[in-house]
Amino acid sequence: MAQAIPFGSCSTADQVLAGVDLTRKRIVVTECNSGIGYATMQALSANGAHIIGLARRLDDSQAACSAAGRSLTPLGCNPTDRESVDVAVQSIRGLGPLDAVVINCSELQYVADHIAQFVLVNRLSELVRGGTGRIVIGSNDNANIIGHRGEDGMFDNLSGERLYDSYAFDGQAELATALFAKELSRRLDARGVAVNSFRCGATGNRTSRAQRLIQSITRHFTKSPAQRAATPALLAASPLVVGMTGEYWSNCQMSLGNPLRSDIGLAKRLWEASARFAAIAFGGGTMSEAASFRHDSLRSRTD
């Protein structure tokens, strides 16, 4: 029986890692230059881990790693660009096996967000140690509310060309992330690599004027970056979660969330569709140059 985890919504990353020695552990953290990514990197590094910090721009990663000031290797990696991913993965390979990979929530719209994660995580998973390695993938709040359209919404309009609603398709991307983690955990089970997804909370990166207004009002009631980083830090490094895999986590606890997250058949279908889409998208070098898939052109939003 799994032991109770004595942490919750108010816990911080430093608290969940108190007393955990991460010396000689090598961990990749994406989106390391701000918010939850920076807080996760800081906490893991403070406990002795060697952090490989990824940001879309090398100078952003360098600035973040310099500010954190411990054992850190900054790398630039634009997950929507094939060459950038290739270079980053090759650099990481040269540093040695990974003990954990933490994929934080990004600012990209549905297809770019999910497919970029799909490709990057699959590439990095080859570098994760068997038996003890961990992969942790972030999912935003909207994944809890998007399931009312049913599973067809995951496949019939992947890019949102026919009806574009930022919250709806952001949520669809994050549900896809949770399903991806579920299927990846199944595929890596034989290697002994644990894969879990977690709720990032509001990232503060959504870009419409209305969304920014809402965020300005609610930011006083939301968790701090250190509190939001508690769950990924727990999943990446705590001995309390050894052997736990394929689960969705929120506030340092396992959470059912959207029931579609447990649909193994849907997870397999999405994996197959994602693999085909990724082959098309990365065949052109960048996401924005990708050909159409299921008669929908690829759309991303990074502004």
Predicted regions, residues:
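Polar helix-capping/helix-linker motif
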Residues: 81, 157, 237-238, 262-264
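C-terminal helical subdomain
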Residues: 173, 197, 216-257, 264-266, ...
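Flexible, glycine- and charge-enriched loops at secondary-structure boundaries
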Residues: 78, 110, 114, 221, ...
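Rossmann-fold NAD(P)H-dependent dehydrogenase/reductase core
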Residues: 2-204, 280-294, 298
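A glycine/serine/threonine-rich, flexible loop-to-helix segment
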Residues: 151-154, 204-218
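Short coil/turn segments at secondary-structure junctions
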Residues: 108, 163-164, 168, 213-219, ...
